[in-house]
Amino acid sequence: MASRLLARSKALALALSRADAAAPGPAAGVQWLRTLSSLPRDPAAAASPAPAPRQPAVGSPLGLSKIPGYEQTSRLSGTQVLPRWFSTGTSNGSSAQQEGATRKVMAFSPLEASIAKPRKGPLTSESWKVKQTELLTRSTYYMIPTLLLVSKNSISTSLLVASVFHQVYMFYKEILLDYVHHDITRKWVFIYFKILLIIMAKETVVYFDLF
């Protein structure tokens, strides 16, 4: 503490002597006040090295001026924190606005866009077809024993025949998928096999006079 006071008094005396020598007269008071206000409060802190300049922001992988960060988004399921790249850009306007223009921050989050807008493509439609086929196969699987027990008319017996042929078709379809690898050949095999089963089911219904 004493060393700080001694250093400050020496600096003040030196400033006073310089002000008296350089600006005599009424202007000396003003110059003295300016010199006094420019003195550092802590001479030890003034002697310390200046802080290192701030490092620039990390650039994005695409080489654009973007800053990585996180932003909270509120949804029905709860609050989610999504990673974002915040790109900075100068606002457009008149020449007066461009001189003192501020940098705007625009948020970019591919993950949020994929959550908000589900993608629709060939894979989505194919998965929907697979789900429909699985549901139909499971339904006919449970319909066969049920109709065997409660079938009392031609309509229920026709449904029973259709369920049995559908199960036969799905069984052979799995076998053909394993052994027929060419797409076009597999497609036509399925078509003709389905036609064959439809004809057999029709002949069965007609033969037993179910309609």
Curated annotation (Swiss-Prot):
Heme binds at residue 166. It comes from the Eukaryota. Pathway: Carbohydrate metabolism; tricarboxylic acid cycle. A ubiquinone binds at residue 179. The chain crosses the membrane at residues 188-210. Keywords: Electron transport, Heme, Iron, Membrane, Metal-binding, Mitochondrion, Mitochondrion inner membrane, Transit peptide, Transmembrane, Transmembrane helix, Transport, Tricarboxylic acid cycle. One of its GO terms (molecular function) is metal ion binding. InterPro entries: SDH4. Residues 41-64 are annotated as: Disordered. One of its GO terms (cellular component) is respiratory chain complex II (succinate dehydrogenase). It is a single-pass membrane protein. GO terms for biological process: mitochondrial electron transport, succinate to ubiquinone; tricarboxylic acid cycle. Component of complex II composed of eight subunits in plants: four classical SDH subunits SDH1, SDH2, SDH3 and SDH4 (a flavoprotein (FP), an iron-sulfur protein (IP), and a cytochrome b composed of a large and a small subunit.), as well as four subunits unknown in mitochondria from bacteria and heterotrophic eukaryotes. PANTHER family: SUCCINATE DEHYDROGENASE SUBUNIT 4, MITOCHONDRIAL. This is Succinate dehydrogenase subunit 4, mitochondrial. It comes from Oryza sativa subsp. japonica (Rice). The lineage of its organism: Eukaryota, Viridiplantae, Streptophyta, Embryophyta, Tracheophyta. The gene is SDH4.
